[in-house]
């Protein structure tokens, strides 16, 4: 599993001392080639962390040899010194690996507004390089965790023997675009940078961009896709894009399943919308209703809160034609009372809300979670 499932990649995860608790906090992923094609998508937040600004520039070259990822500090809103530290991180990785700093992407996650302890991070890169292994993917995934309770990995296999693997972190600040998350995807398929970019953007649009835990957009979101071509197989575009989408969907689902304080995973299906964009807008608006999220936490099938959220959007619909189902029970029909709400079984982890707009044939799925006291507690004490 993870980033070393594909041939041509090595990874490591270590405790460099960035986190005060001594947990793993530094990961290194290296592409040994023969190709080093790469693509990336980043946060749409206008306040971008230093590693995002750096990696955006690196990706313009279409090649990435290595990725350095740290948890325990976001290196966001840290001024010129923060960018200098990111540059120094890439330079150190390039030095120990024998490559160019211009091919080293950097990603960070953690508290905003705090400079990284470079006296620990830079030596840690050398230590991580010494521990690089074709079996190091799981350790790398563990090292990028922040408030995550579990590490997240996924893999998909192509029929001709090529692979797409990946790792992700994220538990809070999960909201489009991208959803806080760091993701590294790897493939040993022989795919050029332009094709990687197309497949990655198509995949993130319908996966990570549709995970919306708490409506808060990170400064550090980074999703990278690296190709080694080590399998020697050049798959057709559709097969390759489907594999990338499968891995992204798996990881996005894991992100929601590990959202901070969550006890329910909520799948919001918007159907019969006039356009896909309107379906996404409605789904996202429902996902951001704190009233609804609290109701789901209390296992209350309060369909009125769904209709109330829909009504705030600009989507095309007639109020007296709206239908809402919760876990398969149509509790609202024609904009009014539907089937007996007591028939709704909400005892299980997953809750499915279906909103039928009766305005067309477009649809979309958005994932979110409930709002709990644990979420409030965790985020009220995050920096203390």
Spans of features found by a protein language model:
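A structural signal for small-residue-enriched, beta-sheet-centric alpha/beta enzyme cores
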Residues: 1-85, 94-384
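Generic structural marker for isolated residues within well-ordered, non-membrane alpha-helices
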Residues: 90
């Amino acid at each position: 599993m993870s980033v070393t499932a594909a041939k041509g990649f090595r990874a490591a995860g270590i405790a460099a001392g960035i986190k005060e608790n001594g947990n793993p906090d530094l990961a290194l992923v290296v592409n040994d080639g023969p190709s080093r094609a790469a693509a990336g998508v980043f946060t749409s937040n206008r306040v971008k962390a230093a590693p995002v600004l750096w990696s955006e520039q690196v990706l313009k070259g279409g090649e990435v040899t290595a990725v350095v990822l740290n948890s325990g500090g976001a290196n966001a809103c840290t001024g010129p010194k923060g960018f200098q530290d990111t540059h120094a991180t890439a330079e150190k990785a390039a030095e120990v690996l024998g490559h160019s700093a211009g091919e080293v992407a950097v990603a960070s996650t953690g508290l905003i507004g705090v400079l990284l302890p470079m006296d620990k991070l830079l030596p840690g890169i050398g230590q991580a390089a010494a521990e690089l292994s074709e079996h190091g993917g799981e350790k790398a995934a563990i090292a990028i965790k922040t408030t995550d309770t579990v590490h997240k990995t996924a893999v998909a296999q192509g029929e001709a023997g090529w692979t797409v693997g990946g790792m992700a972190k994220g538990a809070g600040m999960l909201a489009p675009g991208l959803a806080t998350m760091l993701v590294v995807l790897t493939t040993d398929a022989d795919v050029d940078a332009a094709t990687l970019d197309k497949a990655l953007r198509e995949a993130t649009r319908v996966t990570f961009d549709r995970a919306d835990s708490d409506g808060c957009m990170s400064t550090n979101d980074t999703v990278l896709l690296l190709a080694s071509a080590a399998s020697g197989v050049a798959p057709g575009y559709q097969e390759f894009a489907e594999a990338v989408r499968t891995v992204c969907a798996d990881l996005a689902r894991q992100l929601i399943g590990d959202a901070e304080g969550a006890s329910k995973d909520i799948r919001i299906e918007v159907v019969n919308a006039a356009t896909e964009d309107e379906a996404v807008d409605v789904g996202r608006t429902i996902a951001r209703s704190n009233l609804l999220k609290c109701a789901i936490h209390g296992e209350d099938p309060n369909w009125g809160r769904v209709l109330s959220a829909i009504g705030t959007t600009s989507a095309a619909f007639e109020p007296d034609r709206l239908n809402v189902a919760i876990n398969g029970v149509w509790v609202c029909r024609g904009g009014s009372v539907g089937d007996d709400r007591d028939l709704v079984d909400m005892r299980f982890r997953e809750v499915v809300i279906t909103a039928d707009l009766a305005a067309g044939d477009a649809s979309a799925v958005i994932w979110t979670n409930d709002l709990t006291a644990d979420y409030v507690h965790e985020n009220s004490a995050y920096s203390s």
